Amino acid sequence: MTYPLNPELMYMMPTHFGPMSGPRQGPGGKKFAFEQDQRKCMAVSVSFLTNAAQLQELLPPGFELMGEPVVTVFETYMKEIDWLAGRGYNVLGVNFPVVYQGQKDRAVGPFLTVLWENLTDPILTGREQLGFSKIYCDLPEPVVYNGETHCTASWMGFRFLDIKLTHMKEVAAVDYPPSSSLPTDGTLSGTIHYKYMPRTGEWGKKDAAYAVLSPASEKPNPPQSLMQGEGTVEFHRARWEDLPTQYMVINAFSDLEIKEYRGASIQHSVGGGDLSNQRILS
């Protein structure tokens, strides 16, 4: 007798052992068991102005640049995550502001071109369930010394990124940048992604290809602390031999012109949603 799939529960491969536990489903199939997650986060970011024509080459169908071509590179270090039973992991992302126009939906926000993570579990759930463009790399904890913060990323011994933050100064809570107001004209707002899943056996064809949205929160949690200052980013150009499956990603960022840096930040916060409100943009 074969096993049935319960349409009320979430499954991922391998399905043979029952519903998969993860960020949006706890043990026993309990949905949204961790939506009040109180993880502790440290987020480091550096932004720079680049060449708009170079960013346009990275845009999927329906996407256009919005405003200045400012790229933000960020690393976030997370601990005490509920759905991992108190464990943590780190992420590295690259985004820039876009507008997406579908047949029905219009959305604005940062386009998350890629998100590296140093743990398999969030990579699989994020790619399959949410449509994030997630891949793996090593993301060690930042090194803080002599007034500087250094962050790196590597893959099997090849270091492909260096981030340096300097002259960081504490920002008083009354001076925190205001949260972006949500559009009132029906335009959606949040982080925008492009989900693509290839079709098995029909190489070059897709099982899924569409834009998805992580909706912006109406009441985002303010950070516990914020520092602002200066920063630099350097992606180290790679050969195929260095990064056989990622060299083209690294080199695309390495080739971006840096016209000027637009500041850096270090932010500490507590909490994080389970992204159960993730939706397809149609």
Question: Regions from the language model: what does each represent?
Answer:
Residues 38-40, 86-90, 145:
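Solvent-exposed loop and beta-edge segments used for protein-protein assembly and interaction
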